[in-house]
Amino acid sequence: MTNLRKSHPLMKIVNNAFIDLPAPSNISSWWNFGSLLGMCLILXILTGLFLAMHYTSDTTTAFSSVAHICRDVNYGWIIRYMHANGASMFFICLYMHAGRGLYYGSYTFLETWNIGVILLLTVMATAFMGYDLPWGQMSFWGATVITNLLSAIPYIGTNLVEWIWGGFSVDKATLTRFFAFHFILPFIIMAIAMVHLLFLHETGSNNPTGISSDMDKIPFHPYYTIKDILGALLLILALMLLVLFTPDLLGDPDNYTPANPLNTPPHIKPEWYFLFAYAILRSIPNKLGGVLALAFSILILALIPLLHTSKQRSMIFRPLSQCLFWTLVADLLTLTWIGGQPVEHPYIIIGQMASIMYFLLILVLMPTAGTIENKLLKW
């Protein structure tokens, strides 16, 4: 008789994806982030479900309902902070996961990569709408500023913004629809993530060398299940240190002031994980130009497979490309820092230089480095 996990229609799918899956024998800890992202998503859906039981999406009661969750609901404070800081962990894992794909050339799996880009955009939309729900000052003004960017679209811009708002300003209708979208999107993300995994398992995982590992595969279980559990424990440790010791470290103090349309905060800024894109947006002194740069700063990821000029897949044996890759990482950290600073000298010029550098590295320098490396190797 065949083993049940190999014969049962449902168990068979799980078996082929997580148990008997042939995996490369040499994948490093950089390959842990996929499973960590799955864990972050499940954590956020579960904590979000319990938060939604007590939250009210009405402008008059939203702020107090969040305060009520933190003060009066059993363990409400820990659920709320696990949800908020879980989102930060989600983005750390996302950026690490995408960075790994960039470094080791995983983007040559076109379908998997492009679905990953769609996932990134969907997660960013979800996080943005979630940040608006507590209805503090930064929630309200963040929602106003970011949705207002769409008014830069010629001809239909203003109508589009008012349609999204459900009125002539960010108000009750906006908050209600943002809550509805914030609730449904994680389930859509889960579905897209399954398609992401489906396409990945069509080709099998990449590995640090970037060459085929068909001749040396090992079963996913127990080797990588144990490795993933270690990663999960470290992630939970980091998250709980954040939640239990400094829950507001990554938040904005302005969000503890109830939303007031008549009083603009001195520095409107999004959550830390959007600061790099916000810095690119602010570095262009033209509204439409800034919006286009903002959109392109994320969508540029979809172009990366087309910009791959090297005859080697991974960067592991390409020192020139490695230097440029880590320059890009440093540049993104610089942009993240600038995004949180006020719009004044010298931050303006630093932001503009870092924005130019970002696009220059991806569109020009990295493809050129790939060609130079081919020439140096006489390929």
Curated annotation (Swiss-Prot):
Localization (cell): Mitochondrion inner membrane
Binding residues for heme b b562: 83, 182
TM helices/strands, residue ranges: 33-53, 77-98, 113-133, 178-198, 226-246, 288-308, 320-340, 347-367
GO cellular component: mitochondrial inner membrane; respiratory chain complex III
Membrane topology: Multi-pass membrane protein
Superkingdom as given in the UniProt entry: Eukaryota
Cofactor: heme b
Cofactor annotation comment: Binds 2 heme b groups non-covalently.
Keywords of this entry: Electron transport, Heme, Iron, Membrane, Metal-binding, Mitochondrion, Mitochondrion inner membrane, Respiratory chain, Transmembrane, Transmembrane helix, Transport, Ubiquinone
Alphabetized Pfam families for the sequence: Cytochrom_B_C, Cytochrome_B
GO MF, any single term: ubiquinol-cytochrome-c reductase activity
Annotated residues for binding of heme b b566: 97, 196
GO biological process, one term: mitochondrial electron transport, ubiquinol to cytochrome c
Entry binding sites for a ubiquinone: 201
InterPro entries found in the cross-reference section: Cyt_b/b6_C (IPR005798), Cyt_b/b6_C_sf (IPR036150), Cyt_b/b6_N (IPR005797), Cytb/b6-like_sf (IPR027387), Cytochrome_b (IPR030689), Cytochrome_b_C_euk/bac (IPR048260), Cytochrome_b_N_euk/bac (IPR048259), Di-haem_cyt_TM (IPR016174)
Family to which this protein belongs: Belongs to the cytochrome b family.
Other noteworthy facts: Heme 1 (or BL or b562) is low-potential and absorbs at about 562 nm, and heme 2 (or BH or b566) is high-potential and absorbs at about 566 nm.
Cited function: Component of the ubiquinol-cytochrome c reductase complex (complex III or cytochrome b-c1 complex) that is part of the mitochondrial respiratory chain. The b-c1 complex mediates electron transfer from ubiquinol to cytochrome c. Contributes to the generation of a proton gradient across the mitochondrial membrane that is then used for ATP synthesis.
Quaternary structure, from the entry: The cytochrome bc1 complex contains 11 subunits: 3 respiratory subunits (MT-CYB, CYC1 and UQCRFS1), 2 core proteins (UQCRC1 and UQCRC2) and 6 low-molecular weight proteins (UQCRH/QCR6, UQCRB/QCR7, UQCRQ/QCR8, UQCR10/QCR9, UQCR11/QCR10 and a cleavage product of UQCRFS1). This cytochrome bc1 complex then forms a dimer.
Name of the molecule in the record: Cytochrome b
